[in-house]
Amino acid sequence: LARREAARQQRLEVARGHGRRVAMRNVEAKFPLPDAGAVRQRAEALGFECTGTLIQHDTFFVVSNGKLKLREQRDGAWLIHYRRHHEKGFELSDYDIVPVSEPLKLRQLMSAALGVLARVRKRRTLLQRAHIRLHLDHVDNHGVFGELEAVLPEGEDPASCRTEIAAILAALQIPVGQLIDVSYFELTR
């Protein structure tokens, strides 16, 4: 577990420090949350610790391959391109992150060049246990959702992370049949 977290941190430090493109992978499971408080209590009983709450503004741009978004929050901004592969409610994502020093200018440029597909604003409470993060998301105009995310070290088989996430979902009392496999903005389309 420590090895996975160290690998993830190393990739993020390279991205933050040098502005280079960093390819990463994760396994995700997203689900509606009728009772975020109960899920948070169960997660904390499993050893998850709250690391903070963020206000995030995501602008999705029109692209022909995958999804491209500019994520802005108080401590920084990132351009994120990702491609998802769905399997039984779990999503394997291949993604690239580039830190952005001038998000307003980039958002204006990308909006003019590509067009805006959607905007999503959310308040995200982040809980973490080893290499697995639990997001409790209050999404404007969409509701409350949870998302489990496990970052994969290079070369690791995603099957082990899917197994871990499935066990956590069961402990949180989230049925696999409730998993959703779309971005928040796609829920109303």
Question: Could you tell me what each predicted segment is?
Answer:
Residues 4, 11-23:
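Short, Lys/Arg-enriched N-terminal segments with co-localized hydrophobic residues
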Residues 23-131, 172-189:
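N-terminal strand-loop-strand beta-hairpin
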Residues 37-39, 155-159:
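Short acidic, Gly/Pro-enriched loop/turn segments at secondary-structure junctions
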Residues 89-94, 146-147, 157-159:
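A short, polar/proline- and glycine-enriched secondary-structure boundary/capping micro-motif
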Residues 105, 122, 143, 160-167:
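Residues forming well-ordered secondary-structure scaffolds
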Residues 116-154:
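Conserved, surface-exposed functional patches that form binding/active-site neighborhoods
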Residues 157-180:
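Mixed-charge, glycine-accented linear interaction segment located at domain edges/termini
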